[in-house]
Amino acid sequence: IMQLTGNKTLQARLTIRVSKNTLSFSVVDREAEHQVIYEPYTVKSGVSMAANLRQAFKESDLLQRGYQKVRVYIDSPILLVPIEEFHEEDLGVLYQHAFAGHHSDAILYRVQPALNVVAVFPINKDFKMVVEDNFQDVRFTPIMQPMWHYLHQRSFTGIHRKLYAYFHDKKLDLFCFDKNRFKFFNSFNAAHAKDALYFILYVWKQLGLD
């Protein structure tokens, strides 16, 4: 049984989700009641997210299982660059022009071939180091990536163009596709429903949707 459990831990990929104020861990487990084990972590205010993660390794049941593979979903501002205009050596300068306040972060990117863009996003260097020190196989991914892929497939159903809204962490991500490309993508702070509604209607009108 111990050997079997060890093999499952080696094969499984843990998921870490991190935003400005939240941190959680999850893993697919076919023997669990809902086939997924989800563990939110209570973030200590006034302490860096890297320090919170270090402490979580001492407290979290999932982190203490010894997983070697992890995917980290990062909720940070995303810059989309068309594939044909992407040059890796320009990433830092390009991102700093678009978003201020990330000079001390590592700038990462993930190619989105189905959408012909590259998603560029930052991660705190200390947080990145804590992750890489504790896992052998690490994949950093923008939090919107699975949502983009799922809704891009959905966008081909029906004859009308669609505007998608994703609410999370007191924010609103709005995006629209035109075949295999983004027609629109932007993020808004929207702690209240009336703010979200305003942004949705504004973008709807801006895009000329019916």
Predicted regions and their residues:
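Beta-strand residues in well-ordered beta-sheet regions across diverse protein folds
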Residues: S26, Y73, F175-F177
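Short, solvent-exposed secondary-structure boundary motifs
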Residues: M2-K8, F99-G101, H152-F156
